[in-house]
Structure formats: C-alpha cells, structure tokens
Amino acid sequence: MTTPQHLSDRYELGEILGFGGMSEVHLARDLRLHRDVAVKVLRADLARDPSFYLRFRREAQNAAALNHPAIVAVYDTGEAETPNGPLPYIVMEYVDGVTLRDIVHTDGPIAPRRAIEIIADACQALNFSHQHGIIHRDVKPANIMISKNNAVKVMDFGIARALADTGNSVTQTAAVIGTAQYLSPEQARGETVDARSDVYSLGCVLYEILTGEPPFIGDSPVAVAYQHVREDPVPPSRRHADVTPELDAVVLKALAKNPDNRYQTAAEMRADLIRVHEGQAPDAPKVLTDAERTSMLAAPPADRAGAATQDMPVPRPAGYSKQRSTSVARWLIAVAVLAVLTVVVTVAINMVGGNPRNVQVPDVAEQSADDAQAALQNRGFKTVIDRQPDNEVPPGLVIGTDPEAGSELGAGEQVTINVSTGPEQALVPDVAGLTPTQARQKLKDAGFEKFRESPSPSTPEQKGRVLATNPQANQTAAIINEITIVVGAGPEDAPVLSCAGQNAESCKAILAAGGFTNTVVVEVDNPAAAGQVVGTEPADGQSVPKDTVIQIRVSKGNQFVMPDLVGQFWSDAYPRLTALGWTGVLDKGPDVRDSGQRTNAVVTQSPSAGTPVNKDAKITLSFAA
C-alpha cells in the first residue's frame, strides 16, 4: 500500500522531507488556504497495527493541545481512505530550516552563547508542554529545528505521553522508549518518567551542540544506555575549551543520574542558562577545574620543617596472622589459574575438536540499523552496513542481511546489514512548454513512472502546454512518487459584470475588477443621456474567457422614445415631440375617413409608439378627415 498523493481533496503531497520510525513527512500544499504545510503520514505498512495507529493518534492529540511559538503547530488531522483502510495523517506548520543534528554534523559545535539561547528557547517549549501535562520523551537534536529567521521549534511528540497516563501498563513495561544517546537513566531502566526526564535529555542535547558529540558513545544502544545509568559524563569543557566552568555546572546538573538532583523543571534550567548568558554564576554546583582538584588533594604542610616522613603502622584485628595472609594469597592465585585453564581448554576444544559453534542469523528486517547491529553483535557476529536504495523499506530500516536470516554461521563471522536509503531518487527534469505527451516521455526517461495531469488557467499561448510540475523542476524526488503535470487550460472564464448607467471610465474599472482588462468603447444610437453606458458585448452575466475584448456601449444621446400620438391634434403633438428633442420634419400622410377619431386628430404614426427615434428623424402622421 502506497501513500496517496492527495488527502481529503485538500492537501497535495510533494517531496518527502524526512522519515521517522513509523511515519514519513511530506512538504504539501493546502489547496484551500493556499499555503505550504508539512504533512506527517503513518507508514502504510503500520496503519493496520492498532498499537502504531493509537500512538500516531496520540501524537496528534498531544501536539494539537500545545499552542506555543517554540513548538511546531498542528493545523489539522484526518484519515485518508485507501483500498486497504484508513490512513491517518497530521497537518503541521512547515518550518523552513535545519535541525540541530544537521547543524552539528555540518558545522561542528555551536558557539556557547548561541547554544545557550537555543536551549533556553527549547526549555520554554518543554516547560509549556509540561505545564499542560505532556512530557516529550524523545528530546534530541533531530527534534529541534532552527528556522531561517533563527526561531527555535521543538517538534515530533510521537512518543509523548500525558503525565496523567504515566501509570498505565505501557509506561511501566521494561521497553525502552526514546533514542539511546539521549535517554534519561530512568528511561534506560524502563521506569516511569516525568518532566525531569526531558530535562536530562535536553542536557544531552546541550552537551552535544557545545562539544560536537553526545555525552556517551558506545558500540550499541545497550552500551550507551548502560553508560547513562552507571557512568558520569566528562565535563564539556574538557572536550571543548570554549565552554566555561559555569556552563559546565548547568550541563552536569541537568545530567544528574538522580532526578532529585537535577533541575526540577525546564524553567529552572532556563533561569540558570540566562544567568550564565549574562555573566552571572548559576545556582548549579560549581564544577572544579583540574587545578582546583590538584590543590585540594595536595598534602598539608609538615608540622615542622625537615621532619621525616614515616609509614604509619596499620592496625590489625585480633587473631590476624601472617599464616592467614599467606592462605588468602594462595586462594586468589588458585582462582586465577583456574580461570586461565578454562580459557585454554575452550580454545583447544575449538581448535582440535573441529568447527566453531554455528549460530543462526536472526531476522532483523525492518528494524533500525542500530537495533539490527546490536542484535547481530549480541549473537557474536561482526557487522558491516551497506546502504542501498529500496522502493519498499523506509530509509534507515533494514532491508535484509547477507547471509540471509536463518543461515548458520560460525561465531565471529561477518554479516552485512543492508540498510535502506529510501526509494531511488532522480532529478525532476524541466518540462515547461512541452505538450503533456512530450513531458511524460521526458519524465519516463528520467526514471519516473506515475503521472497525473492538473489543469490550470494560463495565457492563450500556453493553452495545452505544460506550465510546471510538482515536485518542481530540478528537485530530487523518489522515482516511485507521482508527478503532477500542470497543464495550461487557457484564460480562466469569468462572468461579465454589469456597469449600465455608469460612464465609460467607471465601467472599465468595474470590468477590470472582474478580470477583464481588454475593453473598447463604442458609441451607439440610444435614448439614454450622452456618455452613459447602456450595455456591453458580451452582455453582462455571460461567462467568457478573461482575455475576451469587452465592448463598452456608450449612448450618443441622439434619440428619444416615440410617444403615442394617436387621437391627439397636431397642436398638442408638436409640443410633446419638441420637448423630447425632436428637430426633424413632419411628413403628412393621406387623410383617413371613417377612422372613428375626431376630425384632424392623429389616426396613424410612424415610427410607432415606444420606438427609439433619432432626434432629427422624419415623422409621418395621418389625420382623420
């Protein structure tokens, strides 16, 4: 099942921005609000798994409840209907920027003052979420973005959980949730966590952006988790000279093993960071320098100059004897010899007795590369990672192994882990100006297979030609993605607006507001006042292409409407006609007998009543005899 390119007839998916363990994030266009958004879609292969489905829904609920400038906003959620069932998605604010992980990988450590500013803003975001009863549980550099205007944005509440839910069975299991290098000790032990766990993880992030590497590094996630629980971190200043002792103190307090010894809230950590930023001493305990440690451990001065140093006698308990000391030493030697003999015998059996013990290669398909490596190394195999494109398996997850799962190998032999880099990528060619058929062929030649045409208004010259593509030309995209080919449909149709009764200039403005800019003024014979618009061609209300030339019909003011003169005497009819502006001549028709009208009254007239007549036109009247 593949991800549809259109969701709910509103969101058009574009290029993939990134992948997570259970989702993929697309740049998308909100067709209703005409803005770019980021759309996170649950991986199609996980949509049918109730646990992943509920976890994804929980992320949407958690993030939607958090409205803060330093937290990526959630605009909408929904489910797309697919042949295999509903596919949930989350519509989020699109942040045009880079993650802290990318910054450190590309540019190395961040200057301490800037690092303090970034983490202080992240503290605000986390403190806001904690106040609303939600802990993040996966704070790491990849989940903190810096936008192009330097705004800090915390994102991905994918494994966040409401504090009110922390007593349920999911949280209490021994399953470790989060990323190994940023786990709090209580997370690593599978214990219930609270907001102080996020403080620890944020301390790990601060450590990494100051020094260029996380506080603990190991060959496997298990090894790193062990260090979080058991080992103290090296002060950041020993790895990067620009870190001050005051900043050391803040980092190490955030990284305290016991949650009670850490900052109790993200707000407390932010307050100490601001103090350090302003050149003040933090509330965190001071971290001693090497010189200060040496000074404290130096021997006190002798009571008097030149006094000889003597070994102090060691008191021994009653009954202690030299014979007992000797027997203990012999016992320790015997244990050591036995351990060495065990190793020698084991090696001899393997060398003389035949092949080493065979071990079955476990199935690690669709696990993360780190988890797969740990599983294989725990079986005694050496591992090497080979990254390759795959159209089915999401990036960062294992395609398979070589030898394949189920094979039996000798312990210590090498297994190649094939890790997906995602679908094969290709550069979208520029097909603007081509016909749709030509564009499809050019896109096929570039490696793409799925296409969809979308009409869009254009100039007459662009009608039937490609205007653009989505993804855009010269961008890389997965070859399995559908390419939208935007084809010119010619000028957009619009109704002609009415401007009757206006003057010509006002009419032009009204038509331009409706999208019609090509107009011509035509004077016509009409009874209306001179200069008054009496209509348009095409007539108002008609829908026509916006590039249509609209005739604005303006009255010459040279006509009047012929009145009904039948039954009137000429002495009455003449004043009526002149009052209407008539300046023409009377054409007297033949008299009419037996008309029923009074003698000399008008019996017939031409033009007939109600007809527009030029003011200088000839009028024919017949009178009763």
UniProtKB/Swiss-Prot annotation:
EC number: 2.7.11.1
SMART domains: PASTA, S_TKc
Localization in the cell: Cell membrane
Protein kinase domain location: 11-274
Secretion signal, residue range per the UniProt entry: none
Positions with a binding annotation for Mg(2+): 143, 156
GO molecular function, one term: metal ion binding
Main location: membrane
Compositional bias per record (Polar residues), positions renumbered to this chain: 597-611
Residues reported in the UniProt entry to bind ATP: 17-25, 40, 93-95, 140-143, 156
PROSITE patterns, per database record: PASTA, PROTEIN_KINASE_ATP, PROTEIN_KINASE_DOM, PROTEIN_KINASE_ST
Modified residues (Phosphothreonine): 171, 173, 294, 309
Membrane protein topology class: Single-pass membrane protein
Domain PASTA: 355-421, 422-489, 490-556, 557-625
Similarity comment: Belongs to the protein kinase superfamily. Ser/Thr protein kinase family.
Known function: Protein kinase that regulates many aspects of mycobacterial physiology. Is a key component of a signal transduction pathway that regulates cell growth, cell shape and cell division via phosphorylation of target proteins. Probably phosphorylates RseA.
Subunit relationships: Homodimer.
Protein name: Serine/threonine-protein kinase PknB
Source species of the chain: Mycolicibacterium smegmatis (strain ATCC 700084 / mc(2)155) (Mycobacterium smegmatis)
Upper taxonomic lineage: Bacteria, Bacillati, Actinomycetota, Actinomycetes, Mycobacteriales
